[in-house]
Structures are given as C-alpha cells and as structure tokens.
Design a protein with these regions (language model features):
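Flavin-dependent oxidoreductase catalytic core characteristic
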Residues: 1-308
Length: 308
C-alpha cells in the first residue's frame, strides 16, 4: 500500500535523502553519548580499582604511572561531556549541523576508545578475565561497533569532516560553484562579484593571521574569567591560521582537495580540535557552577590544553 511509504506518494524515491538527513542528526546523539558514557564508566571503574588494589604495600593509585593514566582519562572524559552538551544543544535548537555531528561522532568515539584502553591498562589482569566482576570487557568488545557504524571513522575523518565542511562553512564557495554551473545570462556577472568577495575574504584572513602571528597579544578574548581568556586567544590565533591554510589548499588543489585525503584529514583535525576547545570553554563558563569551578579547573585546563 502507498501509505507504507514514509511521507506518502510524494516521497517515492527520496528514501536515501531521508536516511542521510536523519543520519546527520542521529550520529550527533547516539554515538557521542555512547562514547562519553563509556568513558564515564571507565573513569569510575579505573579510579575505584586504583584506590583498592595494592602492590608493594601501596594502593596502585599512588604510583605516578597510574596517576598519569587516570589524569588522561579524567581530562578526556570532561572534554567528551563538553562536546556532547554543545552538539546536542545545537540539535535541540532545530539545527542540522552535519559537519559538527561528524566531528562529534569521530572524535568522541575515538576518545572513548583511548579512555577505555587506559582503563584496561590500569586494571591489567582483572580487565582481561571475563565474568560478572569485569566492568570493562563488554564495553571493550562493543567499542569497534561505535567506531564503524553511521560512517566508519576512517571515512569520516578523511572525507567528511573537512571535505564537506569546507564547502558548507565557506561563505562564498558554494555560491561560486553554483554560479559556475548556472546557465542564467547574469551568471558571469554574479561569478565575478563572488570572486571579488572571495579574494577580499582570503586577503583579510591572511592579514589577520599575519597580525596575530607578529603581534599575538592583540588576539581578542571576551570571557570575564581570567583562566579562560588565554585559551580564547589561542583559539582565535589557531582559527586564523587554519583559515589561511584552508584557502591556500583550495587555491592549489581546488576540487581535488577531497582526493588529497591525508591533507583533508589533517585540516579536519585542526578544525575538530578547535571545536573541542570551544566546547570545553563554553561548558566551563556556562555549565559549571561558580562554587564548583575550583574543583573543575584541573579537568578544564587538561581538556582544553589537549584540544589546543
């Protein structure tokens, strides 16, 4: 029957479009939530184990090697929670940020894998013995599923994050491509206007990056919190440099940028970690109560420095 088709007759042949549309939002909810929940469980399990397990008459949590792993777990778990909150807030506002959800899916599942590996290292022999007392093994076995589904992570990093992001986020690039393929009489005039704007935009990016490179103290910061201001300045300086590298890559490679997967992936990494740093800053400013900031500060500093 026709009413078995989602949306009825007018949606015949649009199944793939509907699926991709749902994927863009869905991968920003389920898999990032799985990544951060995995990290939270691993953090709790590893820290409790480090407190009760003894070696040479001392709790293993007193050894610096274990402390280093626990600090890494704690900082990355904070960063994941900050990214989860920022991403879902955007989705809750009705936005469909497909590039942002790709960033969240890739980096939060990878961070979840890193955290779980560190927790397994801490629990050592206990972590590799299956049974009801093993709180990590089932998550360790299931983690490759999160890495694979809704866009395998290799594909997401190499093709989707920057390959799609540069087209969607550039203020003029998409309009320029549309004008090139347009058959309207005024398409040439429109293209010339967009080209002038693009050149002006790239020139402004280059001058801004040069100014911040030579005079780094001129970087702006809006936060009232002194511990946040230096990170805001670092984000502004790095974003200016990324804009120049992205423009230069587009100028040299053009449409072949997607085929230069290693370059696209590295540029995507920079963009992704800038997003992670902004998420960490926003979470610390807006979600952490003033009375709790002193306790949260070590997590915030570790997570933001890791992202930058």
């Amino acid at each position: 029957p026709m009413d078995f088709i989602i949306g009825g007759q007018k949606n015949i042949g649009r199944g793939w479009q509907m699926l991709v549309s749902c994927l863009g939002a869905g991968r920003g909810i389920s898999l990032p939530a799985l990544g951060v929940s995995t990290s939270q469980v691993a953090f709790k399990s590893a820290s409790e184990y480090a407190a009760v397990r003894e070696q040479f008459g001392l709790a293993i949590g007193q050894f610096e090697g274990i402390q280093e792993k626990l600090a890494d777990i704690a900082g990355k778990t904070y960063l994941q929670e900050a990214m989860r909150v920022l991403t879902t807030e955007g989705l809750g506002m009705g936005l469909k940020p497909s590039v942002v959800t790709a960033i969240a899916k890739y980096h939060m599942t990878e961070l979840g894998r890193d955290v779980l590996d560190s927790a397994m290292d801490i629990q050592a022999g206990k972590a590799i013995q299956n049974g009801p007392q093993n709180t990590l093994a089932s998550g360790y076995v299931a983690q490759p599923i999160a890495i694979t589904v809704e866009g395998a992570n290799i594909l997401t990093r190499n093709l989707m994050i920057f390959g799609q992001g540069v087209m969607r986020c550039h203020p003029y690039l998409q309009s320029m491509v549309e004008s090139i393929h347009s058959e309207d009489k005024g398409a040439d005039k429109e293209f010339n206007g967009i080209l002038r704007k693009t050149i002006g935009y790239s020139t402004a990016n280059s001058l801004r990056a040069f100014r911040l490179g030579v005079l780094p103290f001129t970087a702006s910061a809006n936060s009232a919190l002194p511990e946040v201001r230096e990170y805001e300045k670092a984000v502004h300086k790095l974003s200016a440099k990324l804009a120049v590298y992205a423009d230069f890559s587009l100028l040299v490679l053009g449409g072949k940028l997607k085929q230069a997967e290693m370059l696209s992936a590295r540029l995507g990494d920079v963009m992704s970690f800038l997003y992670a740093a902004m998420a960490s800053i926003k979470y610390y400013e807006q979600k952490v109560a003033s009375s709790e900031r002193e306790q949260a500060a070590p997590y915030f500093h570790y997570a933001t420095r890791f992202a930058l």
